[in-house]
Amino acid sequence: MPKHLSPEQVAAYERDGFVFPIDVLDADEVRALRGELEAWERDRGAPIDFPEKSKSYLLFDWADRLVHHPKILDAVEDVIGPDILVYHSTLFLKEAHTPAFVRWHQDSTYFYLQPHLHVTAWVAMSDATVQ
């Protein structure tokens, strides 16, 4: 029995290789996490960028809390099992009206992990529309 996902969501992941949306954070949690990121940016006087954007969970308590969030881990466990390791994490901040985007891709091409049993948990921390 899945811990967080429905049996239908697990089946969709197994069939399609992805499943969305998955509710894991409430509005207060998102506000708090984003607030800590924005406070760091204000203190620094610039938006977060590399190298801090990569593996940020090693640098920031708020990012560590996010990658260890029980609902995220439960959803991941539902599709790959309980042996979970955070291998990589990148913050991708796309402000409104900017041309930034990420093309459809498969991380296994770049990570060289065997077996190819890994997932990406994309967590939105702002409202977004189709437009």
Which sequence ranges carry the predicted segments?
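Non-heme Fe(II)-dependent double-stranded beta-helix
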Residues: 1-16, 20-113, 117
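Extended, low-complexity, turn-rich repeat/linker tracts enriched in Gly/Pro/Ser/Thr and Asp/Glu
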Residues: 127-131
